[in-house]
Amino acid sequence: MSVLFINGSPNKKGNTARLASELLDGRAYETLDLVDYKLYSYGQKFDDDQFDEIVSRMKAADIIVVGSPVYWHNMCGSVRNLLDRFYGPIRSGELSGRKFVFLFQGAAPEPWMLEKAEYTMSRFARMYGMEYVGMASNSGEARAIAQKLG
């Protein structure tokens, strides 16, 4: 089973990556650090844009884990930008058959932040046909979701 962790944090070995390693403990997985990719804003068109490469890696995975630190009471810009870019070029249901997990970690995310993030990510997963397994914001939640992944 192929697992892809998309790390939205600019800190490749930070707390978001740590939470992913706790979730995926014992599983082989690939990491895609968004900070290493040229992912332009929705509506911009440049020859060196790597959106298609990111989508291709997502299509090759059976399990997709997206991780974001909490920045300004919300998910980080790189993850938000990735979601925005899906609108239009990617058809509804195009990622069906995959499992999707969201990691959202920060020093002290408030309940309303977690609710908004989970709403957005669960809708994203369903729109593109993925099974939304859940969201983890701490180690205990990550371990519980790991059990659901089997």
Task: Please tell me what each predicted stretch does.
Residues 96-135:
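Short, glycine-/small-residue-rich phosphate/pyrophosphate-handling segment
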Residues 1-91, 122, 126-150:
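N-terminal beta1-alpha1-beta2 submodule of the flavodoxin-like/Rossmannoid cofactor-binding fold
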